[in-house]
């Protein structure tokens, strides 16, 4: 039950429709390999949540409509969130970044851009990182053709 509760929060955070700057549709299947706790430390340690993530997958669908979805293998929740953006940056073999903008004050004058998912496509094995509060997860992806 605790696992489902954590993954539901994860899904609420990630399973969103958001603007995309994509030229064509692309799909990645990503699998978590390790999870670290980074709170107040220069030396990340293995997270207690590792068993809830490792081995589980996230599918990242980026379409040209312009929308994108992130779907985990044990949950499906969709939520509108205009502060989420997926973008492609770099050279010919570009990496994909899903980031959100947090408004730090009531007036919205202080903002912070936070990377949630980063998929590196310029290496032979596609790697991704996923940030959730003080948790940093890493894994590998396959591009679905």
Which residue stretches match the model-derived regions?
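Short, exposed beta-strand-loop hairpins at the edges of beta-sheets
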Residues: 125-136
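Positively charged n-region of N-terminal signal peptides that target proteins for export
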Residues: 1-5
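Short structural boundary motif marking the start of a folded domain
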Residues: 23-30
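Contiguous, well-ordered beta-strand patches that form the walls/edges
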Residues: 69-109
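Extracellular secreted precursors and ectodomains with disulfide-bonded cysteine-rich loops/domains
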Residues: 28, 139-140
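Sec/Tat signal peptide C-region and signal peptidase I cleavage site
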Residues: 18-22
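Bacterial N-terminal signal peptides
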Residues: 7-17
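Short, solvent-exposed loop/hinge segments that bridge or flank secondary-structure elements
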Residues: 31-72, 108-116
